[in-house]
A protein has these predicted regions:
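Conserved phosphate/anionic-ligand binding catalytic regions in large, soluble enzymes, centered on
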Residues: 17, 66-72, 151-160
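Exposed boundary/loop context
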Residues: 1, 7, 18, 55, ...
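Feature captures the catalytic cores and cofactor-binding loops of soluble hydro-lyases/lyases
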Residues: 12, 23-25, 29-128, 145
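Acidic, glycine-rich flexible loop/linker segments
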Residues: 102-177
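N-terminal, positively charged, Ser/Thr/Ala/Gly-biased leader segments
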Residues: 1-26, 31, 158-177
């Protein structure tokens, strides 16, 4: 995510949306292509999601989003569909880190999650730490510079690759005795 402004339509769901409905377990070890993983996103919760989602769209949910098993595809299926961010009242810790480590912005903002309605236009201003929707503007706690670096790089793997490449191309520092 290099864009500091995310704009899209809200896809709103409830509390305790677990990883089994984000990405069905039956595909966990059988699919590896991005397009195949994307096609099965939320199919048991919202069969219209994968065909209808557009780049920049935002998932909005209640409490404990991403609970359940540690399934990386629960985050990557959203990334592969172009989801710009997930806004929730709260996240399962394991999903939260999986999302960030895969370049998916996960925002804890209970007021926005409650105010946003399904299908409405949503704007996430990352630089201002604000969510805007028809009901108004809602502030969220900023992510640390390190975490934002990971998200902006497109995930932890890309972040580490970039850091290693930068270190490899940096001029050698003289050794001091």
């Amino acid at each position: 995510m290099t864009n500091r402004m995310i704009q899209g339509r809200a896809w709103k769901y409830g509390d305790n949306i677990n990883t089994d409905v984000l990405f069905p377990g039956k595909y966990t070890y059988t699919l590896s292509e991005r397009a195949d993983i994307a096609r099965h996103a939320l199919e048991d919760l919202d069969p219209a999601f994968a065909a209808g989602v557009r780049p920049g769209d935002v998932l909005v949910a209640g409490r404990n989003f991403g609970c359940g098993s540690s399934r990386e595809q629960a985050a990557t299926c959203l990334v592969y569909n172009g989801v710009g961010a997930v806004i929730a009242e709260s996240f399962s810790r394991i999903f939260y880190r999986n999302a960030l480590n895969n370049g998916l912005l996960a925002i804890v903002c209970p007021a926005a999650a409650q105010a946003i309605t399904d299908g409405e236009a949503v704007e996430v201003d990352v630089a201002a730490n604000a969510v805007r929707c028809a009901a108004g503007e809602f502030a969220f706690a900023p992510l640390s510079a390190g975490v934002m670096g990971i998200v902006q790089a497109g995930g932890l793997v890309e972040y580490v690759k970039a850091r290693l490449a930068a270190e490899a191309s940096a001029p050698e520092k003289p050794v001091r005795a």
